């Protein structure tokens, strides 16, 4: 499953990344906006001028279809590792669920560009699930969740950046 979403921003890439990688904001985003049951920045090394790596761990209880819930349980705890490259204004990430990690591969990127005086975000996600008989169902669920979470995240970030 591949997903690509594009958003326009009325801020500089520097302002976007400063908020995105603010550890306190990341936790608030998950707890106040995305409905996470827990959220913690486990580590963040480097900075926005030279590049950084952040490990974020969060738990969620999304409304899952029966077969997905049976595989992953009521709560999904995810570890997200993001690597930011300031020269390309891009962060790449991997998301590893606590359950079925060996059968689930999720990676993506957020890239920012400047176009006509505004910032354009391109969010991309690639999810591959190798669970016999359930892979496509889980991939569709991941796509649905990604779209919903991105929409909520954008609104929350806009409130902070543009509000």
Regions found by a protein language model. Give the residues of each.
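Soluble, non-transmembrane catalytic domains of enzymes that act on hydrophobic metabolites at membranes
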Residues: 2, 40-43, 98, 105-109, ...
């Amino acid at each position: 499953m591949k997903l690509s979403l594009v958003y326009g921003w009325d801020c500089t890439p520097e302002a976007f990344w400063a908020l995105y990688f603010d550890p306190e904001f990341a936790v608030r985003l998950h707890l106040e906006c995305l409905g996470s049951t827990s959220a913690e920045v486990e580590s963040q090394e480097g900075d926005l001028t030279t590049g950084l790596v952040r490990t974020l761990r969060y738990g969620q209880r999304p409304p899952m279809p029966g077969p997905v819930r049976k595989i992953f349980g009521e709560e999904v705890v995810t570890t997200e590792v993001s690597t930011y490259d300031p020269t390309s204004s891009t962060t790449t990430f991997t998301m590893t669920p606590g359950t079925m990690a060996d059968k689930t591969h999720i990676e993506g990127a957020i890239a920012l560009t400047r176009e006509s005086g505004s910032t354009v975000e391109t969010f991309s996600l690639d999810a591959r699930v190798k669970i016999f008989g359930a892979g496509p169902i889980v991939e569709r669920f991941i796509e649905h969740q990604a779209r919903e979470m991105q929409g909520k995240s954008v609104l929350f970030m806009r409130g902070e950046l543009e509000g």
